Structure formats: structure tokens, C-alpha cells
Amino acid sequence: MKGLRTPAARAVAAVLTEARNKAGLTQREFAARLRRPHSVIGMIESGQRQVTVPEFITLAKALGADPVELLHAVIRQT
């Protein structure tokens, strides 16, 4: 899982986790909004699974966050 060790991959996981917490959602609640198993959210947040750009946008919107602002947060962390 070489790509998951990159600073950018870690930043994506951290930013999405922070946004979920800010939204006041558990992993299960977030997953329910997306109609996905909660294990998918856990894998993303723990860095076991990368997300594509379209998926990042979907995740951000499901959290009520601006995808561009979240991407800027990722860039600031790298």
C-alpha cells in the first residue's frame, strides 16, 4: 500500500475525519448517508483505502462541506 504512506494520502484521511467529526457524525452515520458499509469509512479514515477525486467530492458534500475548501486543507497539510 505504497500510496497510502504519502503525506497527501494521510492528509486526505485526516481532513475527511476532521470534517466528519465537525459535522457531528459517527462513521456509521456518515456511511448511512452514503449508503455504504461503515467499514468503508473506517478504511478511508485509517488510510487503508484511497479515494478518487469524484469520491472525495461526494464524501465532502455528504458532510455538508465544500470540496474545494477540504482540498485546500489537504494541500496545507502536505
PLM region spans:
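Short, charged recognition helix plus adjacent turn
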Residues: 1-2, 61, 69-78
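A short, Lys/Arg-rich alpha-helix, primarily the initiator
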Residues: 1-22
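Residues within the helices of the helix-turn-helix
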Residues: 17, 28, 57
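The alpha-helix within a helix-turn-helix
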Residues: 20, 31, 60
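DNA major-groove recognition helix of helix-turn-helix
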Residues: 45, 55, 63
